[in-house]
Amino acid sequence: MFLLVSGICPDLYHVVQRFVIYICERRYINKLLLTYLTTNNTRSCILYEDNITEKHSEYSCLCFNSEESPRVVLFDHSRGFWLSHSIPRFPSFPEKGYLYPSSGKVYGQTALCVTYQYAQLLRIVKQLVYLYPRIYNCSVPAVFSADLPQLIQLCEGSRPPQASCRRMEQLSSARGDKFVSFVKSEKYVDDIYTGWVAQVLNADLLVESWQNQGHALPSNCSLPKHAMNIKRIQLPTSIQFQSRYDHSKWCVSRVYEDHVTCLGDLNREKAQLWGGGGLICTYNPVIYKAFRQLVDWYIGC
């Protein structure tokens, strides 16, 4: 499921489509985290985010962050979910209960929550090694130690060895929907959208990302497949805003027939060329239509 969260449209406004919910009522996200806040010793949980200023321990959950966006992974030996989103400093530490940060109420945000079978979650852990996330809460019960030695290393603050500076993994949701995960370490110094994802997926990409740091990367058409910056978003019912008010990070294929949609945690900013992060992509036509129709204006080459 994708969520598009906007801080600039009226509260209580939401439009539900298949796979996609456009919302402004932040408390809906609370329901996604009820399981996280009630974890036990038969589940493993990971949360990660940037700018961590507090350290906590002795809680049956693992929490970690990548370059720009927090993520949550919660699973048992049957299945679990991977929640990726662009909301800074969210979720909060478990003992604080559910808190939605004030910083997430002003700008647009996105979230992607996918349920996977346990075998797929083992693949996800391999992707996390390349992200080398900043873990701020971690729980890997002993029952998982044989399957997840790399996850235990991450929780302990050490970095497992990497075969390269980037990795791509095919994933399948519990219902059978196909996804492609792209992750890069800080050693892959390039724009992930232009230099890698667009070329692998063989599609020109229209990219929405946070470019308010003063060093935005321009639209790039130097390679066979291009990455072009979105500048204006048009939500359903005529809600429109400039990209400078949008903290989300996602892209869609320019050509409708390609049906590519990706949600990520990296901006097209110069500083993030040296950062770890990634994208989760799908060819689902319904999801693509929901995101592609949001593009009101982009900068070509």
Residue ranges and their predicted role:
Residues 1-301:
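PLD/PLD-like phosphodiesterase catalytic module centered on the HKD motif
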